Amino acid sequence: MGQANVKESYEEFKSYGYADDILPKTSENRDWGTFNYVTVWMGAVHNLMSYMTVAGFFVLGLSVPQVLWAVMIAALIVSAGYVLNGYAGQKYGIGYSMLLRSSFGVKGSIIPAICRGLIAGVVFFGTKTIIGAQSFNVIFEKIFPGYMNMVPGFDFLGLDFPTMLSYVILWVITVGLFLGGMKILSLFSKWSSPIIYIFIVGAAIWAISVAGGFGPIFAYAPAKPMENWLVFIACVSALVSNWGGPIVNIADLTQRAKHPKAPMIGLPLGMITSYILFGITCVGLLVGTQIAFGIKDFNVVAAIDQIGNPVAVIVLLLALNIGSTSYVVFGNLLPSGLQMTALLPKMFTVKSAAILTALLGTVILPWKLVNGTAALYMFYSFIGSMYGPITGIMLVSFFIERKRKLDLSSIYVKPGENGEYKNGVNMVACGVLIVSFLITLSGSFLPNVPLLANISKSAFLSGMIISSVLYALSYKWNKSSAITQRETTAKVS
């Protein structure tokens, strides 16, 4: 469980031209303790997109106990993903972009790096920012009455002027926070969490009170009950997909661990306790306001707006946006910047790559991706189809194929060298990734094929299982073939 000594190799790898951001962390640069890992996601779990996701569960027919079970099961799965996929990072001090090379090859790692850093990172940044911008509309309308009536008739690719202005403001805040550096981010994560919890818990208590207490909330029954347990599994998978990005690139955080137990204790402790509280506050706020005010489609922003006190509404929405911003910075801009730096070190720094991600996140017109529950779950299916297979391959590669041991010299290679795989590509891993992605996503386009449709609805979990099984079988088959070939050669000799 110890940490490898990479100090001797550091200068050698640095001489090859690798940027400081992607070199293995030496003991001097490992500055995160258990408390940092406990708090890193504590505020981020309370973000508007997560509340929208859980609101969708009630629309799909889940009862209050079923929603709470879905949240708790998702927390356990995400925590396990953090610990397992973060193990190599804390042991060797390397981040996601370089860890990928051990599984996919020096050049083959480009495929999953682009999936996580560019495609998914861009989409996630855009969607979370536009959701935050919509809540900013409510905030600004409270502060500046008539804000939503500015420039009537304005339409920019489907975006009205007030929302566009709110989007730009939140975009600048998010990117500016990231450009402040890791120390600023660490302080932000550490001190924003208590603020978020104070106001979220307060709002939940208010909602439970106006609904008449816990009794009516737990007795609440959806208008249309859940069709079958596959819907429940799909809901769990949607929540896991929401955290699929951090699961994939958790090594970017665990590489900074002062000691091995810091992330192994801190990440599960922070995620599980935070998610249990998230489940309670989310259910209390959504169901409480539904009972008291009949909020349509469990709209969380509309629910908060029912508080009546303008100051309370503003502060609570700001608190939720702090959580969303924390997630976007740590879960999207940071990994996207690191991946692009690893792919094109002469063209990008972490900060310039993150700015590109933020710009592209706007170019994709994210406001068209979150215009309803169906669109949101299609989004989860898409990103889960990428995150799940990547996670499965990485876990099998490190724990089964490599037995938790890495050769950093085959990862940090000299310019022009390909490492341990022919032409720098692990064809088996890349092939399994593509096949798993196609199988997992195909149900979204073939809804009349029940098996594929159900696989797609649980994209992250399905993709991870499919890729794990396929890659493990491929490894066992290749290993058996190699042994047979050696035995045949020995007999001939």
Predicted features along the sequence, with ranges:
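Hydrophobic, membrane-embedded alpha-helices of multi-pass small-molecule transporters
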Residues: 34-51, 166-173, 207-211, 221-285, ...
